[in-house]
């Protein structure tokens, strides 16, 4: 059976416009003619300007999460600064709007993803959304099964509304993984 590629005109990327992985997801989306919605907030340094959606104070509050809960869930401590809280709130909007989630980062031994990006991956798990992480350190894609991470050689975007997020420290292999993902899918 022949698999038909997604129609890019039907798709929307939900991301965050920050430097690194989010910017690379946006560049790939633009190259393929995909609409972009980049959630941001006043005072955030955005690298992308296409599809900017500035979240209001009330919208940010919708994505608020207890840092005590998050610290227990992620097995680490987070700083309680207004900027970090807004970053977590904006990530909530990315994941909430995406039907399928793609992350660039590093999976730690405890199964969580490193950094603030890890909240996006954990929220996707909690919402039971298809979740893929490209681990830059292992140079490989992983898919969350609901219980564990398993190798996924060539994932494709299969939902019209998808989220792309990840580390600000994007390595060449991470950028290639994003470009290859879009080329396979569209």
Each language-model region and where it sits:
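Acidic/glycine-enriched connector segments
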Residues: 3-186
């Amino acid at each position: 059976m022949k698999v038909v590629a997604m129609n890019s005109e039907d798709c929307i990327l939900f991301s965050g416009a920050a430097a690194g992985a989010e910017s690379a997801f946006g560049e790939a989306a633009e190259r393929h003619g995909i609409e972009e919605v980049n959630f941001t907030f006043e005072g955030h340094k955005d690298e992308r300007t296409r599809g900017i959606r500035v979240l209001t104070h009330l919208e940010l509050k919708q994505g608020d999460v207890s840092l005590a809960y998050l610290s227990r869930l992620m097995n680490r401590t987070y700083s309680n600064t207004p900027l970090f809280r807004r970053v977590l709130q904006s990530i909530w909007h990315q994941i909430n709007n995406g039907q399928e989630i793609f992350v660039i980062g590093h999976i730690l031994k405890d199964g969580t993803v490193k950094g603030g990006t890890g909240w996006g991956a954990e929220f996707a798990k909690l919402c039971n959304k298809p979740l893929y992480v490209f681990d830059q350190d292992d140079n490989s894609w992983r898919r969350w099964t609901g219980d564990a991470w398993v190798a996924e050689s060539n994932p494709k975007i299969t939902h019209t509304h998808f989220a792309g997020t990840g580390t600000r420290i994007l390595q060449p292999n991470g950028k290639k993984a994003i470009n290859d993902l879009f080329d396979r899918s569209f």
